[in-house]
């Protein structure tokens, strides 16, 4: 019989799948291992929490596929002393992963229900270097300052200059870019002295990023 602290089979497969699909950054893998995805999914989806699939949450949004979470996180090359902006809090799962790898996360959510739930969940689980804001991801207030890294977790037809202007020198931004329906492409931007360096990564499918704060929900 395995020891009491032996990971359940589904979590072992979760970890193995990330490695098989090319996730190699040990800090990212540890964060994916330590953040309990089952605490961020809907009650009825707990049995599927460790499956490599996106799951629905409130307000018609989703908690992203674990591979995509790990991939986007790895591509940001996060450091312990960095400040990160996340657009699209959702359940707070990606937020929690980021918080284990940097100094501070500011995350913006347009749905009050999701923002309130994520804030309470993250506080309960002890992720204390996170600030959850109800707001418009297309219009970040000036007092928020600039960030070393920016992650967008909803599809944009183009990356607004208002976001790239928030990047510190040598900062990185990752976002799904493309039509609101169908597939998008993950784009990685780096702020270089001569301007933005753009790199196309993998095809993905995200819910659309919408401007403004939701009047309902």
From Swiss-Prot:
One of its GO terms (cellular component) is cytoplasm. The keyword Transferase applies. Its EC number is 2.1.1.77. Pfam families: PCMT. It is found in: Cytoplasm. GO terms for molecular function: protein-L-isoaspartate (D-aspartate) O-methyltransferase activity. It is an enzyme of class 2 (transferase). The active site is at 64. The keyword ATP-binding does not apply. It catalyses: [protein]-L-isoaspartate + S-adenosyl-L-methionine = [protein]-L-isoaspartate alpha-methyl ester + S-adenosyl-L-homocysteine. InterPro entries: PCMT, SAM-dependent_MTases_sf. Belongs to the methyltransferase superfamily. L-isoaspartyl/D-aspartyl protein methyltransferase family. Catalyzes the methyl esterification of L-isoaspartyl residues in peptides and proteins that result from spontaneous decomposition of normal L-aspartyl and L-asparaginyl residues. It plays a role in the repair and/or degradation of damaged proteins. This is Protein-L-isoaspartate O-methyltransferase. It comes from Nitrobacter winogradskyi (strain ATCC 25391 / DSM 10237 / CIP 104748 / NCIMB 11846 / Nb-255). The gene is pcm.
